[in-house]
Amino acid sequence: MSKLWNFLLFQAGWFACVLGAAHQQVFWAVTGSLVYIAFHIWRAQSPKQEFSLLFKILLYGMATDTLIMYLGLLDFRDAWPSPLLSPIWMWALWLLVASTLNGSLSWLRGKPVLGAVLGAICGPLSYEAGVRMGAASWGPEGQILGLALIGLVWAVAMPLFLYWDQSPIEGALAKNL
């Protein structure tokens, strides 16, 4: 799959999940995202390795978003499947982000510092956009602390995800041209 299609499908999934959460109707957004993720894994150079990468990233995302929620920094509008965990639509977003590592974000390979900087900037911007679209709200601890922690989470996440990704660079880049 080309980098352009990977980027466009990520964006479509992001908007669908966030707007679905804002209106408490995430079923079709999550279903569509999961269908895309299944297709992405099926088309991967090494499906087993890609599945493992996506699963690790999903666990990281679930843990960090749940922690941010428990710290009172972020309240999700649609808490399904459980108010004790981050919501399923956020899980879909983490999987969508993971699908970009060997696609539209493959150019970040070997650039962990740039990955950290972009994560620290783009992560909080994405969450703020979701809040402004009505999918979540800042908790009683406030927006500034929430954005700072999300920036830290994503500054760690991007280099970590790139480290976890063991796909051969040449194969991943050639596949996406």
Predicted regions and their residues:
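Aromatic-rich, lipid-facing transmembrane alpha helices and their immediate juxtamembrane interface loops
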Residues: 1-177
